[in-house]
Amino acid sequence: MSIRERRLISWTPRRIRTTFLAYLALTKPRVIELLLVTTIPAMLLADRGTVDPLLILNTLVGGMLAAAGANTLNCVADADIDKVMKRTARRPLARATVPTRHALIFGLVLTVTSFCWLWLSTNLLSGLLAVATIAFYVFVYTMLLKRRTSQNVVWGGAAGCMPVMIGWSAVTGTIQWPALVMFLIIFFWTPPHTWALAMRYKDDYKAAGVPMLPAVATERQVTRQILIYTWLTVLTTLVLALATGWLYGAVALLAGAWFLVMAHQLYSGVKRGEPVKPLRLFLQSNNYLAVVFCALAIDSALALPTLL
């Protein structure tokens, strides 16, 4: 029996499934959920609910390919860190279930495909924004900022804000002020979201030598920063109300008050020296962003009268 025949026989249904799941894990599907939560509302706001469904579908497909490519290349660059941290030790490259070379090729193919898809199905600007996002996330955040500064997620988080820009540009072919405000909402939301999780896994970051803020600062300093960025997030969502109807404005105000209460509770608990549960803020921050952007989508789909 030849080597080729033995390799073909070794591809059992179980191995095929395991390999598929390993490559899927490289793309970090849960991270891609942010794309869905923010891109559709941005597109609906750009044209007040009259967007072609096919354009939305094409933008989502291209955006998901871009996010998958960025996440895969991130896994390649972070393979050494992932092996050390308990939270990431089961990732495919950390466990060597996918060869590094194959993961790199997979990530590059996804990147090129995302650019071509967005360029051909939407416009050149959206494709270029996707490639710029991937380059920024991999080279600026992952390879430069993440290992050198405690403010890594502040500036590196800009990559996670780009889906709204891509969605807006896919509809209009331009970038206008509401898109920039949505960018800032996610930009300010990212530090509280990420640092709350990092507080739970700060020992992991210390062991890996990653200067995430909770790993190098006191809990009081971290929660103070979380509080500041939470306020900035909520205030920015209210600025966006100028371009929306009353529904979004009301939901942004109520959800913002709820988000602020949770951030203040975390800060107050740390200040009093009480046991705190930062993971709760991390989980609820996801719900907060989803509620705000879902309200934006509904408001835009209904084409409610805007203030401006």
Swiss-Prot record:
Keywords: Cell membrane, Heme biosynthesis, Membrane, Transferase, Transmembrane, Transmembrane helix
Membrane topology annotation: Multi-pass membrane protein
Domain of life: Bacteria
One GO location term (cellular component): plasma membrane
Reactions it catalyzes: heme b + (2E,6E)-farnesyl diphosphate + H2O = Fe(II)-heme o + diphosphate
GO biological processes: heme O biosynthetic process
Spans through the membrane: 31-51, 53-73, 102-122, 124-144, 149-169, 170-190, 242-262, 288-308
EC numbers, comma separated: 2.5.1.141
UniProt-listed Pfam families: UbiA (PF01040)
Record-linked Gene3D superfamilies: UbiA prenyltransferase
Principal subcellular localisation of the protein: membrane
EC top class named in words: transferase
Additional remarks: Carbon 2 of the heme B porphyrin ring is defined according to the Fischer nomenclature.
Function: Converts heme B (protoheme IX) to heme O by substitution of the vinyl group on carbon 2 of heme B porphyrin ring with a hydroxyethyl farnesyl side group.
Family membership: Belongs to the UbiA prenyltransferase family. Protoheme IX farnesyltransferase subfamily.
Name of this chain's protein: Protoheme IX farnesyltransferase
Source organism per UniProt: Mycolicibacterium smegmatis (strain ATCC 700084 / mc(2)155)
